[in-house]
Structure formats: structure tokens, C-alpha cells
Amino acid sequence: MTQGAPWKSILLFTVPMLIGNIAQQLYSTVDSVVVGKYIGDNALSAVGSSLPILNMLLVLFIGISTGATIMASQFFGSKSRNDLSYTIGNSITVTLIACAALIAVAAPFIRPLLTLLNTPTDPVVEGIEDYTVLDACADYLSICLFGIAGMAFYNILGGIIRGLGDSVSALLYLLVATVVNIFLDILFVASFGLGVAGVAWATIIAQFIASFLCLIKIIRMREHFDFAPKYMKPVGHYVKTIIRLGLPSGLTQAIFSSAMIIVQSLTNQFGVQFIAANIVIMRVDGFAMMPNFSFGTALTTYAGQNVGAGRYDRVIKGAKQGTLMAVGFSVVLTLAILLFGKPLMGIFTDTEELVEMSYRLMFILAFGYIAMAVTQSLSGIMRGAGDTMTPMWISIITSVIIRVPLAYIISYLTVTEDLPHGIPQCIQISLLVSWVAGALLTTVFYARGKWKTKAIKSN
């Protein structure tokens, strides 16, 4: 990505990743469709209530993946074979240790946390009172936790492959995982009647398959680095650099997930149907965000390789061109959601009232995707250059200082006799405001240019 027209390099790298992200979102969507159609809206709300906690469990590995991707791209750009070898080996070791530690620490707290968050105790299936939404959430999260290594290694190994400039292979492996996940969803839920637990098992099995394929690909890319046990022995410089670069990104996701968990407690007060509506719009929102996330990740690799090669002129050109392309995609998707929102919501449920509620909530969020295009693109540039702290602080400001308090303030100010918890739209309005604030802050800090001084030093 250090040669040729910047926009072309970015677009060619982004498109396979965008398809892969859409595929990943597709099998999350299939989870919801299968649950909503074959089990019911209460089961759909169980999956929805679980997602903020599951995202919180994954933030550690998102951080490791970010650190490994930035290091791999910069060392690949500077052709530092030894540094690249230790980066890959140490990333695998750190991931193994992190998986074991997370399972040991998190397992005892799943059910208490769900109770603390006011997770509904309505029955998942009407007439079966002894299996509630809370029980289904606990089952779903427990299975995902004990299979977390599959999700973790796909994130880390896929990130390294992209850092080396190959976004096509990661796409192919994700497509395989998507097909497997869809097949197993239908088999476990519709045929075997395993319920919400069946959805969790399908996801875990598919992720392990994708991780295994990524590992094989990395072993086959040894023309760029050496892959041997000695490189997996922890070396202080590389472990510290992975943590230094990855910790802010992991904390960013942790902060965002924590905000979602806090807001989930407010969401749960509005009842099972509102929770189900939120899971529907989260799935549609996931698709709408894909171009933004894809351009952001592509620009991280692009910036990393060009910073490694000392080409800051290309980094600046790529930032402008990549952001414009991301904004263009977001405009198209916003119009599509506004025009075709109701049919999209109808894919997930046959309940007309739920479709109407989901569309009204989605209508609010649709206007924020352009702002997120700017945030993700410029944050990607800063991360790729080695500045992972600035995006973290922006996330703290937008998620903790703006979004969470604003949601509760709007809820409090709109309380009436008919709406004892205020208007449910408080969740989406606060999120929209935080997105716009994030875009403004990211633009200001990118323009200041301190990210240009953060390149990684070789050992």
C-alpha cells in the first residue's frame, strides 16, 4: 500500500474487508432471524441483552488485535523481518494467556451481572415459566465465554493478515465461517430445538474454523517473517509495545461497551418489546456501520505501512481520499435506510408493532452515519501511525461524558404518567449526539498532527 494512487490502494483493500464485515454481520443477523422466527420475541430480547456483555468480554482481544495489526503493518512497511517475527509470535502467546485469564475471572460473574442490569425474568416461551430471559442470557454468555478462544484468535490472526496487506484471505475464511454458522443455526435451533444455546454453539464452532484457517494462512506467509517456537517466547519489548498500542484501543471498546451496559440497564426498564426492537436496529445498524469500520481498518493498515516506509505525504493524501469515500458510502446507506427501513425490520419479526417501533428508532440513528464515517476514517489514520491514545480519549468523552448522562437526562425530563421511564427514544438520541461530537473532536485532533510523532521504534 506504499505505491500507486492512495484512493485505489485503500479501496482495493477495503472492498474485500467490507464484504467480510458484511458476512460477519450477516451471520449475527441470521442468529437474530432464527431466534426471532423459531423461538420468539422474548428469545430475541435475550440475545440482545447479552450482546453488550459479550462485547465487553471481547475488548481485551480487540486491543491485542489492534496492537498486533499496527506493529505488523509498520514492520512490514519497513521490511523488519525479525521484528515482524517476534510481533506475530508474541501476539499468539499473549492471546493464549488472556483467554485463560478471562475465563477464570469472568465465569463466576455472568448471572450476578445480568441480575444487576435488570435483565427481564419473563419466560422465553409462553407457558414455560421456569426458563426466563435471564436464564437464556446466562446460557448464551457462558457458552460464548468458554469458547472465547475461537473469537479471540480470529480477531488477532485476521488482524495480522490484514496488517501484512492481505484483506482477501481474511474475507474467504469469514465467508466459510458464515456459511457454517448459518447452517448450524438452522440445524441446532430449528431441527434440534436447542434454543438460544444452539445459536451460541453455532457461533463458537464457526469462529474456531475461521481461526484455524487464519493460522494456516499465516504459516504459509513465511516469506515475510519466521514462524518458530522461539518467537512465541515472550519478549518484553514486543509484549509492552503490543499492550501500549492495543491497550488504548481495548479501553476504547471497553468504555463503549461499558456505556452500552449502563444504557442497557435503562433500556431494560422499557420492557421486552423495546429490548427486541433494539436488537433489530442493532443488526441493521451493524450493516450500516460496515463501510465506516472497513475504511477505518483499511486506513489503519495503510497508515501503518506508509509510516513504516516514512511516506507521511501518502498518509495525508490517503486520509483525505479515504474519508471522502467513507462519507460517500454512508450517504447512500442513510438514504437506503430511510427509504426501505420497514421492510428491513420485517425480516426479523412478524410482529407489526415491533416493526413500527424499530423503524422509528432506526430513523433517528440514520442521520449519524456520516459523522461516524469521519470518526472511523481519521481514527484509523491516527491508530495506524501509532497514536492510539487520542481515539481513546475521544471515546471517553463521547461515551461516558456525553452519551450515558444524556440518555438518563432525556429519560428523566420526559417522564409522564403514561411514560414512567420517559421516552424510549432517549437511547437513540443520546447516541446520535455522541456520534456528531466524536466526528468534530476527531477532526480537530487529526488536524493538530501530533499523530505524526508516534511511529514504532525497532527493537
Predicted regions and their residues:
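Interfacial/gating helices of multi-pass transporter permease domains
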Residues: 35-55, 132-139, 196-197, 238-245, ...
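Small-residue-rich hydrophobic transmembrane alpha-helices
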Residues: 44-104, 151-170, 277-341, 372-394
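Short runs within selected transmembrane alpha-helices of multi-pass transporters and secretion channels
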Residues: 65, 143-162, 170-178, 199-214, ...
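Short alpha-helical transmembrane segments in multi-pass integral membrane proteins
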Residues: 1-14, 72-147, 191-246, 303-368, ...
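Helix-terminus/linker motif at the lipid-water interface of multi-pass membrane proteins
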Residues: 26-44, 114-131, 187-194, 254-283, ...
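Generic alpha-helical transmembrane segments of integral inner-membrane proteins
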Residues: 18, 22, 26, 30, ...
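Transmembrane alpha-helix boundary and packing residues in multipass membrane permease domains
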Residues: 17, 21, 33, 70, ...
